[in-house]
């Protein structure tokens, strides 16, 4: 049996938006701890995230620049983790239906 090497790349980028991805709290580097938070940020029961359009536009522009295929259907999912530095116990992810697929770095 022969094996082929397969290498994947997952890219995370911090976007230069005024607010966070799923709430209207300011995205401010260097701010005092817990000064730019809301019920959505800390995962309070009943607090629902609201996707910020500015962040989506930045993500789509980046995907176009990388030559990705922009998908017509997109969905967010919760990925549950039990890490001490993740008090909500989950991350919001696009594992199954991301905004973009493929692409390359020229």
Protein language model annotation of sequence segments:
Residues 1-106:
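Basic, nucleic-acid-interacting segments
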